[in-house]
Amino acid sequence: MSHTHRDQKKLLARVRRIKGQAEALERALESGGECSAVLQQIAAVRGAVNGLMAQVLEGHVREHLAAADATPQQREQDIEQLMTVLRSYMK
């Protein structure tokens, strides 16, 4: 079973929390909220997305890169895929 499927409830809860934070940010911008409140909302959204990424990344590494039955070629392919995602995320 995939780690994202196994952790689906937790991941969806995180995504819904992010959605709520993004909606709060949108409301703050629409209502002309104070800069400090808007910045705090942006930081909250960023932190929540980083937490989601960390949770999925940890599951991916544990399930795919640490798999005892993976061939060296499969492991190298998994590393390359992961590095592509990380490079994109860090831009």
Curated annotation (Swiss-Prot):
Q: Which residues cross the membrane?
A: none
Per the record, the domain of life is Bacteria
Q: Which UniProt keywords apply?
A: Cytoplasm
GO CC: one term?
Answer: cytoplasm
Tell me which Gene Ontology terms the entry assigns under biological process: negative regulation of DNA-templated transcription
Gene Ontology terms for molecular function: DNA binding; metal ion binding
Give the family, as the similarity comment puts it. Answer: Belongs to the FrmR/RcnR family.
What is this protein called in UniProt? Uncharacterized protein in bioA 5'region
Q: What is the lineage of its organism?
A: Bacteria, Pseudomonadati, Pseudomonadota, Gammaproteobacteria, Enterobacterales
